[in-house]
Amino acid sequence: MMTSSHQSNTTGFKPRRIKTTAKPPRQINNKEPSPATQPVLKCPRCDSVNTKFCYYNNYSLSQPRHYCKNCRRYWTRGGALRNVPIGGSTRNKNKPCSLQVISSPPLFSNGTSSASRELVRNHPSTAMMMMSSGGFSGYMFPLDPNFNLASSSIESLSSFNQDLHQKLQQQRLVTSMFLQDSLPVNEKTVMFQNVELIPPSTVTTDWVFDRFATGGGATSGNHEDNDDGEGNLGNWFHNANNNALL
């Protein structure tokens, strides 16, 4: 019985099949390794090895962008090396302004300023004659021979016009002051010629006091009383007017 059962068990056993299928060989990629795994590149500007890969320019694998930590500048493989300053900057350079500010010339030159002012203060009429004859022309409006109107801009012309306007106002003010100082006394009082100035009459007072001192004539003549208590005063003025007519 034992032998029969053992034979039945051995005859029903099936061995496992071993898979002998080999894996296919790996395909070798022809792509270039990533710049991160490449050896460190030298900076084309300073030949420093302290560089690193940043990113791909315009998402193109053929234009990797690197950064140099030594000179702190970027460069792209196959691209032109631009002269970008450290930290970056705008391409528009700040050009210095070529416009020159025109300084307004003084009213009087340095050499003759004190003499001209003394002449204006002490002798206004003489200074007025010199101005009318062109004596102050060199002091009022000195011109710079190096000034070139063709190279000036709108701003310089506007400033020049403002200076010229100020000088004209100063000249008018000085001219009006000279005219007032040179006018005679009779012309200054022209506006008062139509006013009649009555000189004080000394005849009335002298006559009244003479009559009062002698004690007579103060109450002489017709006594006119207008109910205001001024009858004597009216009589005095009446007699004074009669004596003045005589």
Swiss-Prot record:
Organism: Arabidopsis thaliana
Protein name in UniProt: Dof zinc finger protein DOF4.7
One cellular-component annotation, GO: nucleus
GO MF term list: DNA binding; DNA-binding transcription factor activity; zinc ion binding
Function (record text): Transcription factor that binds specifically to a 5'-AA[AG]G-3' consensus core sequence. Involved in the negative regulation of floral organ abscission by binding to the typical DOF 5'-AAAG-3' sequences in the promoter of ADPG2/PGAZAT, and by down-regulating its expression. ADPG2/PGAZAT is an abscission-related and cell wall hydrolyzing polygalacturonase. May act through the interaction with ZFP2, an abscission-related transcription factor.
Primary localization class, coarse: nucleus
Pfam families xref list: Zn_ribbon_Dof
GO process terms (BP): floral organ abscission; positive regulation of DNA-templated transcription; regulation of DNA-templated transcription
